[in-house]
Amino acid sequence: MRRGHHEAQVLFERLGSQLGHRTRRTWTRQHPTDGVWLLDTPHLGLDEVPLAALEVVVTETGKALRGSITTLEMVSPALGILLIQDREIRRGLIRSGTSPQTATEHLRRLVAAATADISRSRQRLALWTFDQLERRTQLTLNRAA
């Protein structure tokens, strides 16, 4: 697991806990996610319901992107979050010799492709960047302090 992947998981878990949700790193073995917030519903005869699920994209391939979207659709949370770990992807591209300008353009195309793929889903999916996750976590933690 890449560092950026783990960073996103930790922040998502922290945000969910701060919002009062029970959290797990993954949904099930058959449908592994990178994080999930759970809604306990024993009064409905259900053990737990996935309130939000996270899939972190740390590679720049369209195949990986579509695989993450499919995982979110199969889990079927109230909100599926596809997180583009832009910092990790950018670091990897630049480390492999890509210029910063080309890396920025590559990320722009990846976000555009993710937006298009999400728009075709029948699930409620949101596209976040790592910066957006980090900011939401900071705002929630500051509000609680």
Residue ranges of model-derived segments:
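Charged, structured surface patches that assemble and position nucleic-acid processing machinery
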Residues: 102-141, 145
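Residue-level detector of flexible, active-site-proximal loop/helix-junction positions
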Residues: 42, 60, 132-134
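Catalytic cores of nucleic-acid endonucleases
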Residues: 49-115
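Residues at the C-termini of beta-strands that transition into short coil/loop
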Residues: 27, 57, 131
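Hydrophobic, Leu/Ile/Phe/Ala-enriched alpha-helical segments that form helix-helix packing faces
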Residues: 8, 12-23, 97, 107, ...
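Acidic-basic catalytic patches of nuclease active cores, encompassing PD-(D/E)XK
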Residues: 1-34, 38-45
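Residue-level signal for beta-strand positions within conserved beta-sheet cores that form or flank
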Residues: 31, 50, 123
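Long, low-complexity, intrinsically disordered polar/charged segments
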Residues: 1-6, 43-44, 50-51, 110-117, ...
